[in-house]
């Protein structure tokens, strides 16, 4: 393992240059191998999990989901608040901000962005809950691509550009996740589920987030500072991929609804957001079928 660590990190350092010394020794950041391992394990579970559950009953995760989504809602709010106050304290420039001129605010933002990176590892649980509940239709290309890529991208961000212009996308995303995970948590409560009307607008907010992030990134290209230009090009490329995938999801979900899907909405079931469905209809239908067979 040590030989692998040296080989992988030596190649990355040669390709990207020296890492930011301010994050040296931080959990999971010194070596890329743990991040690769967690991603590979995630993809393996995505592949094997549905097959493992194929002949098993879905697991009810209702209580766990409420707690899990509440926790991520609070963590997202904490990150959003700390990033906004850190940017204000450091006098960050919206158009372009380098990684070394914010003083103590840079240190604060680096600390918060580490939590943002770590939250992407926690969010792998989203997919695992789908597998346990046998909601395999929710494990889409968009869902897996977004989850697997974000953890890896933010490992690189934290090691080379852990503050400065990197703040904007994480700030917007943290705010969106406050809305998104609060929706997930509430939709896990049957009494509240019929009153949730804002699922469609969360996806619209996500698309708006990507466009705004591209706009802010492009500003740094037009009015450059000392923030590395290569990271800006990569950021915009990644945003384009998300816009394409999320737009495709949005059109399929909201503009081409099947009659069965419309019936589900009329019956008050919670529908998909970002490839997620928080209804427990599949589990409940399974229980009903078992009872009918027993009778």
UniProtKB/Swiss-Prot annotation:
Its EC number is 2.3.1.199. It comes from the Eukaryota. One of its GO terms (cellular component) is dendrite. Keywords: Cell projection, Endoplasmic reticulum, Fatty acid biosynthesis, Fatty acid metabolism, Lipid biosynthesis, Lipid metabolism, Membrane, Transferase, Transmembrane, Transmembrane helix. Its main location: endoplasmic reticulum. The chain crosses the membrane at residues 26-46, 64-84, 112-132, 150-170, 172-192, 207-223, 227-247. It catalyses: a very-long-chain acyl-CoA + malonyl-CoA + H(+) = a very-long-chain 3-oxoacyl-CoA + CO2 + CoA; (6Z,9Z,12Z)-octadecatrienoyl-CoA + malonyl-CoA + H(+) = (8Z,11Z,14Z)-3-oxoeicosatrienoyl-CoA + CO2 + CoA; (9Z,12Z,15Z)-octadecatrienoyl-CoA + malonyl-CoA + H(+) = (11Z,14Z,17Z)-3-oxoeicosatrienoyl-CoA + CO2 + CoA; (9Z)-hexadecenoyl-CoA + malonyl-CoA + H(+) = 3-oxo-(11Z)-octadecenoyl-CoA + CO2 + CoA. InterPro entries: ELO_fam, ELOVL5. Residues 266-284 have a biased composition (Polar residues). Catalyzes the first and rate-limiting reaction of the four reactions that constitute the long-chain fatty acids elongation cycle. This endoplasmic reticulum-bound enzymatic process allows the addition of 2 carbons to the chain of long- and very long-chain fatty acids (VLCFAs) per cycle. Condensing enzyme that acts specifically toward polyunsaturated acyl-CoA with the higher activity toward C18:3(n-6) acyl-CoA. This is Very long chain fatty acid elongase 5. It comes from Xenopus laevis. The lineage of its organism: Eukaryota, Metazoa, Chordata, Craniata, Vertebrata.
């Amino acid at each position: 393992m040590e030989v692998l660590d040296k080989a992988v990190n030596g190649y990355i350092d040669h390709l990207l240059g020296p890492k930011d010394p301010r994050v040296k020794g931080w959990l999971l950041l010194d070596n890329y191998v743990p991040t690769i391992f967690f991603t590979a394990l995630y993809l393996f579970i995505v592949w094997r999990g549905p097959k493992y559950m194929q002949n098993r009953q879905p697991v009810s995760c209702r209580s766990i989901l409420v707690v899990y989504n509440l926790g991520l809602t609070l963590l997202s709010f904490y990150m959003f608040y700390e990033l906004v106050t850190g940017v204000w304290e450091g006098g960050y420039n919206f158009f372009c901000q380098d990684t070394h001129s914010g003083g103590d605010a840079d240190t604060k933002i680096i600390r918060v962005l580490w939590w943002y990176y770590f939250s992407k590892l926690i969010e792998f649980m989203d997919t695992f809950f789908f597998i346990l509940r046998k909601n395999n239709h929710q494990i889409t290309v968009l869902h897996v691509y977004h989850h697997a890529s974000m953890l890896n991208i933010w490992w690189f961000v934290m090691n080379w550009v852990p503050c400065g212009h990197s703040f904007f996308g994480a700030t917007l995303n943290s705010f969106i996740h406050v809305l998104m995970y609060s929706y997930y948590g509430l939709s896990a409560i049957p009494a509240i589920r019929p009153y949730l009307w804002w699922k469609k607008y969360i996806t619209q907010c996500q698309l708006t987030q990507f466009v705004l992030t591209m706009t802010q990134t492009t500003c740094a290209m037009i009015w450059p500072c000392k923030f590395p230009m290569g990271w800006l090009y990569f950021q915009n490329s990644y945003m384009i991929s998300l816009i394409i995938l999320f737009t495709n999801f949005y059109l399929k979900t909201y503009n081409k609804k099947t009659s069965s899907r419309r019936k589900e909405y009329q019956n008050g079931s919670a529908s998909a957001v970002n490839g997620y469905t928080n209804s427990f209809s599949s589990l409940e239908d399974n229980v009903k079928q078992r009872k009918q067979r027993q009778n």
